[in-house]
C-alpha cells in the first residue's frame, strides 16, 4: 500500500510504430509515420491516420505529433475521400484540448509561451481573470484566461483557460479564429451570445483582445506573473491597490498598501525615480491605477499581470511541493 492524499493515474497509450518500421514505411523526424497531404505513407496504396502519424502544425508549418480523437477521425474521413478521388483541404492541426480535474476545467489551443520561444516567434500575452458570468448571478466563478498573440501583427497564436465554468467555449472561439488567421481586432469585434446566466456582456475573450490591443499600442506597461517573485526578492517598490481589509487577509511581503480609492490623496508616497509595480486582486483596479498614474506623470508605473489572484495560483503549488518560502503572507483563489 502507498499512503497518499491523492493518486493521479496517467495511463494514456503510447502510439506504436514498430510494425510500420518493420514494413519499411518511412518514419518522420518526430518518430511518427511520415504521410503526405492525403495521409499516404511511403508505401504504395498504404494510408495511415491517427496517433501514430506525423502531422503538420497549422501555425508553425512544422511536423508534430498529436494524440487526439477529433483530428484522427477527420484524418480517416480525408483518407477515405482521397481513395474515392474526392478533394480534401488539409489545414494541419493546432492541438485544441480540454480536461476536467475535480471541480476545475482546463483547456488550451495553439501555441503556448514555451512553443513561441522555441520557434523564435515574437509574441505578447494578455492575462485576464474576470468572472465567467455576471457577478450577481449564482455560481459566478473566476475564469483564468491567457491569450497569446504575435507582436506586432496581433495574429492569434494560442490560448489557455482554467476555471469551474465553460472554459471549452472560450478556447473553441480562439481555435476557430486561429484557423481563419484571425487577429486581436477580429476577436475584439466578435459578437457572441449573451445572457447574465451564461456570460458577461463583454466576454472574457473580448476582454483579452482589448487588453492585448492596449499592450500592442503601448497604452501601458506590464510585468508577467512569472517575474513577481524576482521583484519581491529584490525589494522592488510594489503597490497593493486593494482595500486595507483585503490587504490584511493576504499580501505580497514588503508590498505597500495604497488602495485605489485613496491613491489620489497619497501620490507623495509613490516614487518617480524607480519602477513602481501595481497590483490588486485580478488586475482591474491596478490597471486603472496605472493609467491614472501615467496621466499624472508617473511613467515608471507597471501593472502586474494576474495580480494577487494570478500570483497565488502561480506560486502555491511550488511553494507547497518544494517547501519554498512563500512571498505572500497568505494565498487567495477567488474573486470578491
Where are the language model's segments positioned?
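FAD-site-proximal beta/loop scaffold in flavoenzymes
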Residues: 1-78, 173, 177
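Redox-cofactor binding/interface segments in oxidoreductases and associated redox assembly factors
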Residues: 9, 28, 48, 239-240, ...
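Short, structured coil segments at secondary-structure junctions
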Residues: 23, 42, 119, 251-253, ...
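Generic secondary-structure signature for well-ordered alpha-helical cores
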Residues: 25, 81-88, 121, 179-183, ...
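Mid-to-C-terminal Rossmann-like scaffold of FAD/NAD(P)H-dependent oxidoreductases
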Residues: 52-164, 200, 204-230
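A short, polar/charged loop-to-alpha-helix boundary motif
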Residues: 165-183
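Rhodanese-like catalytic fold shared by cysteine-dependent sulfurtransferases
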Residues: 185-226, 231-237, 244-277, 281-336
Amino acid at each position: 500500500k502507498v499512503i497518499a492524499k491523492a493518486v493521479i493515474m496517467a495511463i494514456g497509450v503510447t502510439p506504436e510504430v514498430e510494425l510500420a518500421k518493420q514494413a519499411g514505411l518511412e518514419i518522420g523526424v518526430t518518430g511518427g509515420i511520415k504521410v503526405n497531404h492525403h495521409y499516404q505513407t511511403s508505401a504504395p496504396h498504404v494510408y495511415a491516420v491517427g496517433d501514430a502519424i506525423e502531422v503538420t502544425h497549422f501555425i508553425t508549418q512544422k511536423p508534430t505529433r498529436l494524440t487526439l480523437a477529433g483530428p484522427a477521425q477527420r484524418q480517416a474521413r480525408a483518407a477515405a475521400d482521397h481513395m474515392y478521388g474526392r478533394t480534401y483541404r488539409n489545414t494541419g492541426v493546432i492541438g485544441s484540448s480540454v480536461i476536467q480535474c475535480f471541480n476545475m476545467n482546463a483547456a488550451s489551443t495553439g501555441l503556448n509561451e514555451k512553443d513561441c520561444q522555441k520557434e523564435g516567434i515574437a509574441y505578447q500575452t494578455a492575462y485576464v481573470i474576470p468572472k465567467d458570468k455576471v457577478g450577481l448571478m449564482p455560481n459566478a466563478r473566476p475564469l483564468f484566461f491567457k491569450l497569446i498573440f504575435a507582436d506586432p501583427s496581433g495574429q492569434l497564436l494560442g490560448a489557455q483557460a482554467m476555471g469551474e465554468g465553460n472554459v471549452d467555449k472560450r478556447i473553441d472561439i480562439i481555435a476557430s479564429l486561429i484557423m481563419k488567421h484571425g487577429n486581436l481586432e477580429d476577436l475584439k469585434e466578435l459578437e457572441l451570445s449573451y445572457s447574465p446566466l451564461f456570460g458577461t456582456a463583454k466576454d472574457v475573450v473580448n476582454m483579452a483582445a482589448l487588453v492585448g490591443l492596449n499592450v500592442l499600442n503601448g497604452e501601458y506597461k506590464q510585468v508577467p506573473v512569472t517575474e513577481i517573485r524576482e521583484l519581491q526578492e529584490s525589494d522592488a517598490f510594489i503597490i497593493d491597490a486593494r482595500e486595507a481589509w483585503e490587504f490584511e487577509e493576504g499580501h505580497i511581503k514588503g508590498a505597500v498598501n495604497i488602495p485605489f480609492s485613496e491613491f489620489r490623496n497619497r501620490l507623495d508616497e509613490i516614487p518617480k525615480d524607480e519602477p513602481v509595480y501595481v497590483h490588486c486582486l485580478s488586475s482591474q483596479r491596478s490597471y486603472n491605477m496605472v493609467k491614472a498614474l501615467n496621466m499624472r506623470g508617473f511613467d515608471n508605473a507597471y501593472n502586474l499581470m494576474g495580480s494577487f489572484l494570478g500570483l497565488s495560483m502561480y506560486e502555491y503549488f511550488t511553494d507547497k511541493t518544494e517547501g519554498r518560502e512563500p512571498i505572500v503572507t497568505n494565498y487567495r483563489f477567488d474573486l470578491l
